[in-house]
Amino acid sequence: MRKNERKTRNLKLKVINARGLHARASAKFASTVDRFRSTVEVSRGGLVVPGNSIMGLLTLAAEMGTVLSIKITGDDANEVGVALTDLVSDFFGEGQ
């Protein structure tokens, strides 16, 4: 990788918790993104929002079963991807 080149990671995450990406889950998602330096964009159906924006995430209206496309750009892109995958896999800490 060149000195000024930034890593980009793309992934798809399926919302598996019963309440979907509601306010508390969106806050946890945004908080997770804020722990890192990378830029995160989340998209659904052509709508793209910043991963650290609770209001933006809410506009995606992601119900259970929705697949979100995530684009992560930055030196710690892999770490962000792991953290977000873990968060979603853990039902946003809500136990389903």
PLM feature spans:
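C-terminal structural segments of small proteins and small subunits
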Residues: 63-96
